[in-house]
Amino acid sequence: KNEKSKTGNDWVAQMAIDWEAAADQFKKLTSRIVKMRISLLISKNFSLVKYSILSTKFGITPIIGSKHNTINWIHIDDAAIFIKESITHKKYQGTFNISTQNPISQHNFIKIIQKKVCPFALSIQIPEFLLKFILGKRYSIINVKLKLSANKLVNTGFKYKYNKMEEALENIINQ
């Protein structure tokens, strides 16, 4: 899904629509607006990463929802670099999916964490109905099956420090 694709109708999509409409109000004041659709940030403080690593150290790795769900992601360092560059370089204008070109399934995400932290950890799937009950509308944040396109970002010449999940998690685990 790229920046020009039709938006969804769930809670997250509506939040993005509202935020981008608010950003458009600044067109009267400036000639350049950058709208960032930031995918899941990979950082040591990001809950999914933090708790997946912690629980894996204890021998259990939770699979949140379906193991086939897609994680569109970007390392926090790369997101910070883009934000800085988007302020200082006029080549950035319009809407950008701030994501790597390498989305990953939950299953592969868990396998990487287990490989790096505890290869013998047991994977336990948390049922979707339980997550829907606990999280309500916010469940749509983690129940993702679409892959974002980062082509517009890449076509600007943006260079990732971490374009592979293995490298990103290695960096986080070693912090």
Predicted region positions:
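Mid/C-terminal beta-alpha module of Rossmann-like enzyme folds, strongest
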Residues: 86-137, 173
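Alpha-helical substrate-binding/gating segment
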Residues: 53-61, 68-103
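Catalytic helix-loop patch of NAD(P)-dependent Rossmann-fold dehydrogenases
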Residues: 1-36
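Conserved C-terminal active-site "lid" loop/helix of NAD(P)H-dependent oxidoreductases
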Residues: 106-111, 132-159
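Non-catalytic, hydrophobic alpha-helical segments
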Residues: 79, 83, 98, 109, ...
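Glycine-rich "substrate-gating" loop/helix at the edge of Rossmann-like oxidoreductase active sites
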Residues: 6-12, 38-46, 66-76
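Glycine/proline-rich active-site loop of Rossmann-fold NAD(P)-dependent oxidoreductases
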Residues: 17, 29-31, 42-51, 86-96
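Amphipathic terminal alpha-helices
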Residues: 163-175
